[in-house]
Amino acid sequence: SPPFTSDQDLYTDSR
């Protein structure tokens, strides 16, 4: 998911 959805999603996208 894009890095602007949620904090949790941010970390998932940052892997």
From Swiss-Prot:
Keywords: Calcium, Heme, Hydrogen peroxide, Iron, Metal-binding, Oxidoreductase, Peroxidase
Keyword Cell membrane: no
Cofactor needs: Ca(2+); heme b
Catalytic activity: 2 a phenolic donor + H2O2 = 2 a phenolic radical donor + 2 H2O
Gene Ontology MF annotations: lactoperoxidase activity; metal ion binding
Oxidoreductase keyword on record: yes
Membership in a protein family: Belongs to the peroxidase family. Classical plant (class III) peroxidase subfamily.
Known function: Removal of H(2)O(2), oxidation of toxic reductants, biosynthesis and degradation of lignin, suberization, auxin catabolism, response to environmental stresses such as wounding, pathogen attack and oxidative stress. These functions might be dependent on each isozyme/isoform in each plant tissue.
Record protein name field: Peroxidase 2
